């Protein structure tokens, strides 16, 4: 690994992984350059980043951060980092695989919030929806309950005023 280009790539990978708690490893083999470019764009829109590198370098960078990926790093692999919205990035990967008749990119696994996860967990995460949509749903549920509570208090206040009159 004395190659200067490999050293530079490893340093870049280590820097990119610094502070990242959620990332996925995917097989991208079979995507055209245009499809790969489109995938990068959709991942970037969700606050993520796709990095293609040699498995050996990916493995070294992960081990440097105390994360071991072992068997998943076989065949062509790319790292997909989730900077902002882990579910949104997972959904972008899932949507891209559904568009492709070969099911590529194929998710091999990942780390979510620092915990190693398998393909099924990443697929479930992708089905959740984006962070913003989940937050909007939560706000809607809370505001509906608050509105009901205010209505109950108003009815009780009117009842008390009626008794005092």
From Swiss-Prot:
PROSITE patterns: RIBOSOMAL_L10 (PS01109). This is Large ribosomal subunit protein uL10. GO terms for biological process: translation. SUPFAM superfamilies: Ribosomal protein L10-like. It comes from Deinococcus deserti (strain DSM 17065 / CIP 109153 / LMG 22923 / VCD115). InterPro entries: Ribosomal_uL10, Ribosomal_uL10-like_sf, Ribosomal_uL10_bac, Ribosomal_uL10_bac_type, Ribosomal_uL10_CS_bac. Belongs to the universal ribosomal protein uL10 family. NCBIfam families: PRK00099.1-1 (NF000955). Signal peptide: none annotated. Keywords: Ribonucleoprotein, Ribosomal protein, RNA-binding, rRNA-binding. The gene is rplJ. It holds the Pfam family Ribosomal_L10. The keyword Lipid biosynthesis does not apply. Gene3D superfamilies: 3.30.70.1730. One of its GO terms (cellular component) is large ribosomal subunit. GO terms for molecular function: large ribosomal subunit rRNA binding; structural constituent of ribosome. Part of the ribosomal stalk of the 50S ribosomal subunit. The N-terminus interacts with L11 and the large rRNA to form the base of the stalk. The C-terminus forms an elongated spine to which L12 dimers bind in a sequential fashion forming a multimeric L10(L12)X complex. Forms part of the ribosomal stalk, playing a central role in the interaction of the ribosome with GTP-bound translation factors.
């Amino acid at each position: 690994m004395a190659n200067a280009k490999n050293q530079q790539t490893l340093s870049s990978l280590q820097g990119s992984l610094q502070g990242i708690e959620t990332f996925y490893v995917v097989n991208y083999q079979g995507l055209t350059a245009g499809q790969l470019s489109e995938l990068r764009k959709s991942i970037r829109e969700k606050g993520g980043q796709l990095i293609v590198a040699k498995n050996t370098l990916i493995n070294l960078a992960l081990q440097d951060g105390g994360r071991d990926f072992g068997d998943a790093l076989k065949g062509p692999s790319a790292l997909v980092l989730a900077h902002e919205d882990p579910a949104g990035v997972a959904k972008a990967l899932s949507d891209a695989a559904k568009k492709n008749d070969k099911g590529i990119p194929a998710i091999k696994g990942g780390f979510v919030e620092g915990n190693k996860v398998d393909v099924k967990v990443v697929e479930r995460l992708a089905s959740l929806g984006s962070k913003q949509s989940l937050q909007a749903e939560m706000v809607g549920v809370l505001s509906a309950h608050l509105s009901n509570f205010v209505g109950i208090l108003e009815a009780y206040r009117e009842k008390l005023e009626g008794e005092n009159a």
